[in-house]
């Protein structure tokens, strides 16, 4: 049975009723739960298994029975490991019912259905006693309750409850403890994700300056989770060695503190601005701390030397450390970065955590009082994503737009309509002397931010438009330019910004014949690639450490077919991929004739050997009709694609990715089709791999 759901279409900008199966939400939750990524993490699996074997063997040698509690069992893999390692009893709990039901089937399929007690509820709801959830307390807890911040999934409270209510006084835990690390760094590139810089003209002179409220804003304390190993080597400078800032003892019977702070005195290893804190953690899986799993970036990884010695020739050194997407590293932005003038200069790092998150500050003098968690006071950080803030600062991108604007804006004559959210470049046309600039800014916070920039730069003749259909005919006929980047807050995939075309069509009949429309055209390109790792987030698991997980694969595949888009958004700079062909154009859209339907098909010859496990897609925006590379703004590769080489991707936008259901390493071609119906806001792609 199906039902209708209210869905926002980013291309039309309208809510529409969409027919979906009753269990669509269930399928979406299953497909996006992320269990598959963890199961492809070979280091995690092997080291958890090794810790279970070692710990259970030690408990047996001490004459103890082993009663295991597995909190958040997922597929049940850790419970099955515990049984195989010799546990007397295993109780597994899982509150996510689709996953719990799948685990029950997996237990049966692996011949342990009658050996694992499965409780379909949260661990904090479990009761101990006869005829209750568990007959007795467990003396070995195995769990994976961690995220990139370590504590973001509620690990502190869950462990506190488990020790108080579910575990014996002498219980052991896997992992036994965790250690958090920080490393202070400077990076002009990464800082672009956090604050708005001066926008210069083509001569390098300031065109738009950020107002005082932006310069004084401390930003958001929230983490920026990234694959730190993929930051280009020349784009950051490490100002300190990694330091341990917090330890979390999972085995301790006493409660783990929900709030802690630590002031660390550091010495600069080189001069620079203490702009960033790089953060990661490691876990000691066994009580003796001999089995270590580290989430460190490659340069700080404790096993880098051993891993580098056995790496494949074509794998970059940044990718020799075990890959995982469920536990990454994080960047925290220092509110007011202190300048470290000399090697060896003392400064202080103030480290804090509450029950779910961390925050940091750095200063030259020890603070007299506790450093409070900082929040955005300028609208920038609460309105825009990190990638969008970086986009606003991207020099090459901005120069291409300004090149167009400086060439076409006639001071005191041009009348400009700017479509999009937070379009600083459109605002620049006012600074270039346009007679009037009308900004389409329906979003309240975005409009307030833009207005603060208008006021600070004393720009005249700027007007805000909430709805383009409210524009008077006399205003429209006077327009010389309709300009966009385009960028809209609702956009997820690059072509969601085709909403620019939808807005244009609402005005088309009232615009003057010679009005300049920029961008005038958009082209979508596709590139078959071989990912080193990203494909694993959608790849079937099959078996893991000798356990059959095909039932899990089938469940996820069924749900993905129902609820996962054929193309999803990913920041590809974080996930190395090798080009298997030249990029090919799949669609060209003329914004002056946006309402035309398109149906196209073709094929891409694979010119390089390798496994085509992904197809990357992006949009090139053509600012004018010259086809001059300097008039094209791409959301794809930042350098020319060379088949067989790793692709360098734009770091300030997410690209689209299609993951083939069954990738092959057969040489041949990728057949594709594109179906675009702009009035319905439908853009569909089809891909299939064919032998040559």
Curated annotation (Swiss-Prot):
This is Protein arginine N-methyltransferase 7. InterPro entries: Arg_MeTrfase, MeTrfase_PRMT7, PRMT_dom, SAM-dependent_MTases_sf. The keyword Repeat applies. Residues 14-359, 368-692 form the SAM-dependent MTase PRMT-type domain. The keyword Transmembrane does not apply. GO terms for molecular function: histone methyltransferase activity; protein-arginine omega-N symmetric methyltransferase activity. Essential arginine methyltransferase that can both catalyze the formation of omega-N monomethylarginine (MMA) and symmetrical dimethylarginine (sDMA). Specifically mediates the symmetrical dimethylation of arginine residues in the small nuclear ribonucleoproteins SmD1 and SmD3. GO terms for biological process: peptidyl-arginine methylation. It holds the Pfam family PRMT_C. Keywords: Methyltransferase, Repeat, S-adenosyl-L-methionine, Transferase. Belongs to the class I-like SAM-binding methyltransferase superfamily. Protein arginine N-methyltransferase family. PRMT7 subfamily. PROSITE patterns: SAM_MT_PRMT. Its EC number is 2.1.1.-.
């Amino acid at each position: 049975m199906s039902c209708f759901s209210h869905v926002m279409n980013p291309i039309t900008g309208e809510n529409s009723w969409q027919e979906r199966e009753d269990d669509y939400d269930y399928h979406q939750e299953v497909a996006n739960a992320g269990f598959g990524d963890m199961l492809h993490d070979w280091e995690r699996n092997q080291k958890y298994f090794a810790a279970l074997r070692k710990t259970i063997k030690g408990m047996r040698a001490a004459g103890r029975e082993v009663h295991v509690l597995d909190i958040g069992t997922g597929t049940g893999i850790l419970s099955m490991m515990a049984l195989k390692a010799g546990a007397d009893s295993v109780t597994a709990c899982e509150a996510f019912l689709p996953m719990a039901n799948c685990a029950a089937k997996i237990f049966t399929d692996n011949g342990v259905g009658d050996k694992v007690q499965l409780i379909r509820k949260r661990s904090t709801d479990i009761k101990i006693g006869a005829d209750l959830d568990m007959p007795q307390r467990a003396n070995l807890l195995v769990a994976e309750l961690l995220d990139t911040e370590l504590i973001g999934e509620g690990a502190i409270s869950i462990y506190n409850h488990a020790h108080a209510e579910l575990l014996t006084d002498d219980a052991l835990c896997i992992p036994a403890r965790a250690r958090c690390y920080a490393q202070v760094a400077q990076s002009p590139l990464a800082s672009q994700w956090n604050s708005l810089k001066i926008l210069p003209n083509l001569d390098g002179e300031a065109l738009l300056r950020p107002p005082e409220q932006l310069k004084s804003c401390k930003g958001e304390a929230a983490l920026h989770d990234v694959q730190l190993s993929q930051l280009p080597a020349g784009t950051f400078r490490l100002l300190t060695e990694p330091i341990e800032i917090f330890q979390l003892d999972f085995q301790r019977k006493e409660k783990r503190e929900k709030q802690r702070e630590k002031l660390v005195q550091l010495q600069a290893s080189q001069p620079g601005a203490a702009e960033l804190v790089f953060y990661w953690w490691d876990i000691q899986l066994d009580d003796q701390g001999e089995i270590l799993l580290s989430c460190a970036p490659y340069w700080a990884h404790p096993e880098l030397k051993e891993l580098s010695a056995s790496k494949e020739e074509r794998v970059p050194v940044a990718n020799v450390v075990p890959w995982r997407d469920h536990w990454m590293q994080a960047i925290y932005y220092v509110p007011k970065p202190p300048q470290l003038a000399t090697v060896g200069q003392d400064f202080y790092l103030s480290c804090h955590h509450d029950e779910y998150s961390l925050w940091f500050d750095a200063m030259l003098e020890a603070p007299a009082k506790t450093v409070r968690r900082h929040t955005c006071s300028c609208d920038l950080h609460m309105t825009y994503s990190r990638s969008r803030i970086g986009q606003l600062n991207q020099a090459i991108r901005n120069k291409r737009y300004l090149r167009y604007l400086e060439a076409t804006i006639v001071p005191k004559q041009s009348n400009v309509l700017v479509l999009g959210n937070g379009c600083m470049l459109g605002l620049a046309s006012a600074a270039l002397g346009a007679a009037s600039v009308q900004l389409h800014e329906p979003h309240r916070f975005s409009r307030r931010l833009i207005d603060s920039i208008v006021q600070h730069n004393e720009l005249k003749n700027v007007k805000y438009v909430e709805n383009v259909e409210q524009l008077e005919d006399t205003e429209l006929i006077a327009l010389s330019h309709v300009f966009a980047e385009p960028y809209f807050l609702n956009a997820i995939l690059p072509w969601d910004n085709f909403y620019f075309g939808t807005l244009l069509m609402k005005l088309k009949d009232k615009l003057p014949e010679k009005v300049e429309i920029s961008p005038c055209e958009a082209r979508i390109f596709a590139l078959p690639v071989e990912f080193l790792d990203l494909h694993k987030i959608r790849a079937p698991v099959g078996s893991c450490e000798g356990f059959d997980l095909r039932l899990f694969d089938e469940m996820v595949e069924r749900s993905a077919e129902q609820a996962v888009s054929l193309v999803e958004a990913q920041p590809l700079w974080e996930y190395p991929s090798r080009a298997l062909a030249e990029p090919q154009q799949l669609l060209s859209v003329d914004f002056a004739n946006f309402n035309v339907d398109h149906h196209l098909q073709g094929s891409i010859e694979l010119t390089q050997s390798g496994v085509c496990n992904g197809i990357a897609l992006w949009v090139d925006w053509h600012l004018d009709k010259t086809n001059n590379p300097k008039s094209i703004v791409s959301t794809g590769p930042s350098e020319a694609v060379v088949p067989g080489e790793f692709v360098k991707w734009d770091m300030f936008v997410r690209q689209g990715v299609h993951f083939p259901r069954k990738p092959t390493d057969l040489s041949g071609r990728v057949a594709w089709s594109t179906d675009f119906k702009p009035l319905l806001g439908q853009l569909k792609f089809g891909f299939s791999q064919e032998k040559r």
